[in-house]
Amino acid sequence: MLEIKSIPAFNDNYIWLIQNSDKRCAVVDPGDAQPVLDYLQANELTLEAILVTHHHNDHIGGVPDLVRAFPHVTVVGPKAEPIPTLTTPMEEGDKLELFGEIFLVLGLPGHTLGHIGYVGDSKLFCGDVLFSAGCGRIFEGTPEQMFESLSKIAALPEETQVFCAHEYTASNVAFALAVEPDNEQLRQYRDDVNRLRALNIPTLPTTLRKEKWINPFLRTTNPDVVKSVANRIKNSDPCSVFTALREWKNEF
């Protein structure tokens, strides 16, 4: 059974560490090497793999130093993006074995064009595509691509744990409540999030089931969500609703 820990980095990043029972581990999106090296030393762990979702520096900045510290480490990442010291390029449909567990690679363009995610046994590492109560900004792709990527994630089993790369939950919930002020699950989640953050406890991972109740970007067919953007759209199809929500969030 794999154990997953969060290593905080920068102001709001999480570097996810995946550990097996014999002190071998992998990390996901190490934007900074030092907190990883400190954690590995403190817990006497050996780094065997680095998984990257996309090329932004706060996700790959620590890769070169980690490779220097662990020269035999495998660096897995998107085939279509410039990842330093990449050894194992991946794209949609590829599979990765990690400590006896198989992870399927999902192509998740939108935030960046080559963004990928890794889905294993009831767990998803999705970088900057899906956040709790929110989604990533569209820097390189199109709204249509981002909508399709989120739809791909939404089709996964609802018990899937979602390991996002940023602690954006509180600000995302504030926007979600602007969209759906009468959503009781969302109000309760706001209170839960505030309690956790007051204690400096991560709000992540989340679950896909929870996100379908509280995340407006996964609720684009909900009548209240559609109504909230009625003055911003000509068509009420889900992709148009998503696009309007994302534009609204950019201004929020």
UniProtKB/Swiss-Prot annotation:
The gene is gloB. Zn(2+) 2 binds at residues 58-59, 128, 166. Thiolesterase that catalyzes the hydrolysis of S-D-lactoyl-glutathione to form glutathione and D-lactic acid. The keyword Metal-binding applies. Pathway: Secondary metabolite metabolism; methylglyoxal degradation; (R)-lactate from methylglyoxal: step 2/2. This is Hydroxyacylglutathione hydrolase. Signal peptide: none annotated. Transmembrane segments: none annotated. NCBIfam families: GSH_gloB (TIGR03413).
